Amino acid sequence: MSGQTGWPIGFWWAELTHPYWEFTEHGYDVDIVSPDGGSLSADPWSDPRDESGYSASDLITLGFVNSPDHIKLVEDTRAITEISVHDYDAVFMIGGQAPMYTFYQDKRVHDLAISAHEAGKIIAVVCHATCILLKARLPNSDLLVKDKTWTGFANSEEDYADAFVGQQIQPFRIEDEARDLPDTNFIVHGRFRPNAVRHGLLITGQQQYSGAAAARLVIQALGQ
């Protein structure tokens, strides 16, 4: 629950399950980790079983949450400080409503992204998790997104979400902040349309409908 707005927040299921499906179908092993470890909280609107019916058509997530073996993966995660990026081919960060409150100021999350990039790993960031790219800096103090093209949750999507629930959900807007940054190129496509962008080792996805597309770019990059 957001202390600022009182709105329930968490990760967005499709941003986890759809990339998970893409990776495992292509033969990759996937570990799910989190800043603090332990059980993860999902945004209820992203659960296809939720009475709101908002995500009722998300059959990939429905299969995941009804599988005892898969649901365990989000009930007992390792903390990101317990892993080494050198043991992985890529890092994929998912969003939802929560990262604007939980990732934005968390140095551990920023350090994971920078460590992966510095190790020559692919780093993918989707939806509101892209808020970290407003702050994450390389050892030379440059922003990770300096001279890069990237995307994230759009103002048009924030407008829709706020109007849909009748209140402001997020404390700030990624698009507004990104467009104020010098030497970086933030782009968005149509509202809630799949949009994933690759620039070197960095892959970004616009919102929950872009997770699978971002995962496919990761798979493509790993195959090069």
Residue positions per predicted region:
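Extended, subdomain-level signal for the structured scaffold at the beginning of enzyme domains
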Residues: M1-A119, I132-Q224
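Conserved, well-structured core segments that form or line functional sites
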Residues: I123
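Conserved active-site segments centered on acidic
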Residues: H128-T130
